[in-house]
Regions:
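Nucleotide-activated chemistry modules centered on ATP-dependent adenylation/adenylyltransferase
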Residues: 1-40, 45-212
C-alpha cells in the first residue's frame, strides 16, 4: 500500500460515517501526549467512541514536567463533557526505556530518527495495552501537532497494529482546524501549554533557542 497518497482525515471520516450507519460505538485506546493536544481529539472522537485516554510518555523531562502534564490531563478529562464515556489510564513513567531507545541518537535533530523511535516506543506500549484490554482500536493524539509528520505516525501505527493484532485508527487531527481548536479549548479550560515536545533533548534545544 502506498501511504503517500492516503488522506488520513478522509479515511477517518469514512469510518466514522460507517460506524454511525451501523449504530456501533467501539472502544478506543487513545494515547495522549498532553492535555492540550488531547482536548480537540477528545471533543471530536468522543462523539463516536468509548475512550480510554492512555497517558504513556516516558520521554518527558524533567520528572516535575511529567507530573505537571499528567495532572493537566486528568483535570481536562474531569472537566470536559462527553457524549460517550471517557476514562483515564496512566502508563509507567519508565525513563530508562526512552533513554535506551535514544542511545546513539542524542544529537539527531528533532523530527528525525530519535523521534520516530519515540513514536514507536509509545505506540507499541499503547498497542499492547489495547490488546490486553480488548479495545477495538488504538491511536494517538500526536498527529494534531503541525510539527509532527502524520504520514510517519500512521505508518508506524499501522505497522505496530498489525504486529500486535489490533486496529490502528488512521488520523491527522491537525486537519479541519484541529490544532487551532486545541488552542481554543486550552484557553477555555485554562490548560498549561508547554513550549517543548517533552524529552531532555528537545528541552535543551528550546533553552538554547531562548538564550539566542
Amino acid at each position: 500500500m502506498n501511504l503517500q497518497k492516503i488522506n488520513y482525515q478522509k479515511e477517518l471520516e469514512k469510518l466514522l460515517t460507517r460506524l454511525e450507519k451501523e449504530e456501533k460505538v467501539p472502544t478506543l485506546l487513545l494515547h495522549s501526549c498532553c492535555a492540550p493536544c488531547s482536548s480537540y481529539v477528545l471533543e471530536y472522537l468522543s462523539q463516536y467512541f468509548k475512550i480510554t485516554v492512555f497517558y504513556y510518555n516516558p520521554n518527558i523531562y524533567p520528572e516535575s514536567e511529567y507530573t505537571k502534564r499528567i495532572l493537566e490531563q486528568q483535570k481536562l478529562i474531569e472537566e470536559m463533557h462527553f457524549r460517550y464515556p471517557v476514562s483515564f489510564l496512566a502508563g509507567k513513567y519508565d525513563r530508562d526505556r526512552f533513554y535506551e531507545m535514544a542511545k546513539g541518537l542524542e544529537e539527531v535533530r528533532e523530527g528525525g530518527s530519535r523521534c520516530m523511535g519515540c513514536y514507536e516506543l509509545r505506540l507499541k506500549e499503547s498497542a499492547e495495552i489495547a490488546v490486553a484490554g480488548g479495545f477495538d482500536y488504538f491511536t494517538t493524539t500526536l498527529s494534531i501537532s503541525p510539527m509532527k509528520n502524520a504520514q510517519k505516525l500512521n505508518e508506524i501505527g499501522q505497522r505496530v497494529g498489525e504486529e500486535y493484532g489490533v486496529q490502528y485508527l488512521l488520523s491527522e487531527f491537525k486537519k479541519k482546524n484541529g490544532y487551532k481548536r486545541s488552542i481554543e479549548l486550552s484557553g477555555i479550560y485554562g490548560l498549561y501549554r508547554q513550549d517543548y515536545c517533552g524529552c531532555e533533548f528537545s528541552y535543551k534545544a528550546r533553552q538554547a533557542e531562548k538564550r539566542v
